[in-house]
């Protein structure tokens, strides 16, 4: 009996896991040391927060599942000189919402909603790449100065 219960719990947990959505973007940035190829990979991470409480019979429950999606971005840039620059950062609250009830019962539907917004995610990764260009240029300037000055 314990074996059946444990197997059921494992299967229940396995079916609740949803693969993370990823989106990629590649661009070329001009720099005085030469062109830089930059690749950005955004992985969407959804967090859930249970709020409210269960009410006694005959009263309305205040249970809600508040969720938000963040994009974890990995940047890999390679300069013409062979220098490789990597950076990881997070863009918070690219999507959010709430559902009535327990978070565990809504994880799959929330994941589907986030997947339906993947076109918006492409816009977010392009915007993140644009914001990162100045940071990347500054990193390249520092690396170029170190190699030039010894």
Q: Language model features by range: what are they?
A:
Residues 17-83:
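N-terminal secretory signal peptides
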Residues 99-150:
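Compositionally biased, intrinsically disordered linkers/stalks adjacent to structured regions
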Residues 61-62, 91-95, 112:
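Short, surface-exposed linear patches
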Residues 3-4, 18-37, 130-150:
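A structural "domain/chain start" motif
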Residues 82-101:
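A short, surface-exposed beta-strand/turn
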Residues 4-13:
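Sec-dependent N-terminal signal peptides
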